[in-house]
Amino acid sequence: MSSLLQLLAVWSQSSSISMNSEVAQTNQKYKDHSFLVSQSFYSPFVNSCYWKLVNRRADLLKILFLRRKGDMHSHLFSYTFIFYFLLFKILSLHPFREPAKINI
């Protein structure tokens, strides 16, 4: 019985370590991408929306990965994340740039 409990403890610890490594890899990916975004031609409003997403990414990832079925509170967080992500994607299409001129 004690060996079963030890095995369960080791398994839960290894699963939390793998979750932490996934979050760390995602953090590094966002850090690399955020440098590129800060050097690009985004408008200040789009850039501020991006940084709001970056600052909340780890908490949102944990909520998305660890949510329980039927937990409405975490579902609301998921929908909020999806809304902000789509808003960022729509605003990042550079609507303020002058359209290309085609000479025929």
Curated annotation (Swiss-Prot):
GO cellular component terms attached to this protein's record: membrane
Extent of the signal sequence: 1-16
Subcellular localization, as worded in the UniProt entry: Membrane
Keywords of this entry: Membrane, Signal, Transmembrane, Transmembrane helix
Membrane topology (UniProt): Single-pass membrane protein
Transmembrane segments: 74-96
Other remarks in the entry: Partially overlaps VMS1.
Name assigned to this protein: Putative uncharacterized membrane protein YDR048C
Organism: Saccharomyces cerevisiae (strain ATCC 204508 / S288c)
